[in-house]
Amino acid sequence: PILLIGNAGCGKTSYALELIKILQGKPGIKIDLGNSVANFTCTGSDPSYKDAKKGIIIESMFAGNDNKPIKNPIIHFDELDKIHQDEKYSIETIFYSILEKNTAKQFRDNFFGVDVDASGINYIFTANSLKTVPVPIVNRLKIFHIPDYTEEQFKTSVLDNFYQKWLKINNLKTECFPEVLSDEIKEKILEICKCDSRAVNDAITQVFARTIVYDDAKDSHIALFSAR
């Protein structure tokens, strides 16, 4: 299990999601620990309870397209530093067992009432800081520190990647927009986002909104520049 740690907006979560997609060929299971996640999210809940369901551990092992078991799926736990330790059903207690190979070999899903070998599951954690992460959990993880993006990195690669995703998300015709971002456009985007990856999409939208018009002939939005 690994932990990617770095300041907010450094790209660690995006990297984890892309890495999982590359390794598995599809998106993996992502759990946001900042949302007060209970331990039965992993272990499953008692079938006698209303809305009971299986846990994500066993779910991940049968998440293949053909429903055949997967020995080594990947689960992503985001915002480990926001884990709620003082709650009765804190997920923290589960980490002590699933992050140890020996105990993970006999992991029990409460919904099905069976033990499964979960020792092959891979875990990627992301966090902004180690300060609030329990030491026993830290000791079970291989830690990688992710540095902030430099302005040069933003200009040469980050903005281009975000721009291509922005076009796809907004279903915009690429022939009506710049194939690549010019230095002028990048400067305008950087003025708004301040090298914060979380603000890039909004910054791109703001810059292009100043220039976009609708072309009836092409039945599409087109981008005109300069963005000043």
Task: Mark where each language-model region is.
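Conserved catalytic/switch belt of AAA+ P-loop NTPases
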Residues: 77-116
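Conserved nucleotide-sensing/catalytic segment adjacent to the nucleotide-binding pocket
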Residues: 48-85
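AAA+/SF3 P-loop NTPase mechanochemical coupling elements
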Residues: 67-72, 107-126
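Walker A/P-loop
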Residues: 1-32
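Conserved AAA+ ATPase core "coupling" helix
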Residues: 38-43, 132-172
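Conserved AAA+ ATPase small/helical "lid" subdomain
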Residues: 168-223
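AAA+/P-loop NTPase substrate/partner-engagement loops
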Residues: 22-56, 154
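The Walker A (P-loop) glycine that initiates the GxxxxGKT/S ATP-binding motif of P-loop NTPases
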Residues: 6, 44, 79
